[in-house]
């Protein structure tokens, strides 16, 4: 210990020792009933948690140091706030009883909590990325629910893949350059680790699971063990003895799911609305689950819809059976309503963090699981038969908990009052002593009087001597030899016996020993329960599936939804379809039909803003998605084809912070769609081309439609305000025009929200502006200008560098720039340039011209 540390108080010297070991963490240092933060940590804690910043002496000749603290019993609330802000928190705990400590209390860092490892709250999980060529080896571990998966993902698909999981922290090799968008789009906390950490993690993973290779878990790429090992080792290194049960890793196989990239998830507003509101999301509106397991299963299924007719129909069959057997559905819901989140209980119990009450919750939930198994025996659907056969009877675990713990135990495990009478004979004896101390002493006193014949003998107590036997001087001659003298008084002698000392020890230490013994018995119970947690986890997964299916059934009953026919053909036909989210919050919702066929597979939908174009095309996407989850739909009838992907381009989801213009964002999205869509895909395009000039937008939109028609053949819905696109119906195969109907009145227009064949009569932009409340003067002026523009027939907008007259008027710098652009255009090899590449070239040229003109 250096001179500087010697000058510190012993407690602060101990603090410095641990802080030096965890310099990148906020160190919560246990002092009595508080966790304290010191120095810079205190300043951060005060700012982030709104705590009062105080100070304390640091040692002889030293200035006072900043400090602030939080009560230990509510520390998790404060830790959650820090972790959500991206901080790591090290917990430095007292590891011995302060009352028994000789000198300063022993402390140790028992756990490090990071954004991806705070499993007390369902805040998210931990991910590891390990680059291999043009792909990433990805692992995801969610400690709160025991989910551990791995996959090999192409670099261009990485963001879409990660967006399916609730990831808070990413582990990477030190110096690893991640895709630029990753942190900004997904808002992740990055933790860099040395290369050796990945190698050592791999060895630790294989050793702990007792396998020579991760191929034993079903993985094909051996290098994935580096990524899996990193998250595994990181979790164990940070959580130490509190590490929850980590299941064996499983391969993530996406071949069985409809592809939904991040744009589709945002565009269809699956987990949150475009404005970021979760209460307006599809998930929130359709959720009728009753357990945490079911809720997570529903969310996962919405993000990973089935791409298998067989799996969809099995779910539909189960949903339909529950609808037809309403009493059974009610019984299932009644059973699930009181069930705890078993996946989270497994995590907490295995990490030694579960309270006695949580074990009671486990007992009650296991009893309910057995009730559920009996209810499922009343059903005939294949899924329910499979689940019934796979649900394990864990009454033995429930019985053990029931036999050991009282029905309403205290919240904290060391408070006593946990264990039922009859579990442990010594505990029963201690409790009897505690509750009958005075009676026991009187009985012993009576026994001694009888043995000695000294009727004046009495047992007394003081703080100095403890319990004693007092005999008057006149009766000393009758005292037995086994009495040991303790004290002489003027008129009496005080004695003790071995039996009295044993009784005294039991009485005085009874409560302490009761608490210690109850804690030991609780730990033994927990260890027995931990042995069965794999089986509990198995049941949790199955119960989540039941909850997911009953949620679909209850929703269909509640809303009057109809079973769609999901088929392997091409046509998509919806009769009187509704958007489930918009219908939820709208009175007198107007349903619409959809008919996409091999002959008419591209629908160009025109109409003014606010007429319902965007809502309608999203509606088709949402209904298609729901059908692939096995859900019934808000329709009169529907034939939904199996799709391999749903693509959307809806501009409101642009991430402008990336420094890319709206137009470039749009072109990148369209490029992704045109490069990856197949004939089995569903494409939803909303106002493509609005990020550039009118004629550029029209040209690009026409080229996109033509490419989809000729090269892809995917079912496509294109909402646009460009009426010029409607001429494609005559020129391009598969195009059909539709519009959102508007009624014109003397007061203006009225939106009918009805989809009809044909093109819109006009854009009605000025009418919409009037409805929006623009001043009458502005509306009149706009109408006047519109008439003037409409009168200038034959005039067309052209780019300046194509006009000979303009060339003559520009200065030399501009002329050189335009000639350079023209030269580049002339050098384009049209024969070897795909439409997608042409769009990107056009977008780049447009950006350069815009930048030059602004100069």
UniProtKB/Swiss-Prot annotation:
Pfam families: MutS_I, MutS_II, MutS_III, MutS_IV, MutS_V
One Gene Ontology MF term: ATP-dependent DNA damage sensor activity
Name this protein carries in UniProt: DNA mismatch repair protein MutS
Lineage: Bacteria, Pseudomonadati, Aquificota, Aquificia, Aquificales
NCBIfam families (alphabetical): mutS1, PRK05399.1
Keywords: ATP-binding, DNA damage, DNA repair, DNA-binding, Nucleotide-binding
Protein family (similarity comment): Belongs to the DNA mismatch repair MutS family.
Example GO biological process: mismatch repair
Entry annotated with the keyword DNA-binding: yes
Residues reported in the UniProt entry to bind ATP: 607-614
InterPro entries referenced in this protein's UniProt entry, alphabetically: DNA_mismatch_repair_MutS, DNA_mismatch_repair_MutS-lik_N, DNA_mismatch_repair_MutS/MSH, DNA_mismatch_repair_MutS_C, DNA_mismatch_repair_MutS_clamp, DNA_mismatch_repair_MutS_core, DNA_mismatch_repair_MutS_N, DNA_mismatch_repair_MutS_sf
Domain of life: Bacteria
